[in-house]
Amino acid sequence: MVMTDEMMEIIESSRAYVATATTNGVPNVVPIGFIKPLDNKTVLIADSYMVKSRANLEANPKLAFVVQDAAKYPYQFKGSVEIFESGEYFDQVVEWVKETNPLAPKPKAAILITIEEVYSVKVGDAGKKIA
């Protein structure tokens, strides 16, 4: 098991900040509103606006994210991604976005994250691997 039930609940109920990097190491961070865990090892993101992050993920399919209230929920998640522009995951994010906010633009892709590591960002424990 990688993520606990608490971690999954926090992800589903929060905005996240996703960090990516180019193959040359140039970083990019963006807020993500549509993010939810599918199980204790995978998280799904709806890509409606990503430009630089998407290009980074296509060239370097790794990312890290924290939830908006990292002081209260001090976890950093790291993983590998797959990008889907059609199929089951894409259909799932299109329906999810439509149900949640009918005025939101249709997602361009679904980004499936396989969580590989979880770290603490809590004062005193920052950088400690949790899972």
Residue ranges of model-derived segments:
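Binding-site signature for planar aromatic cofactors or substrates
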Residues: 1-131
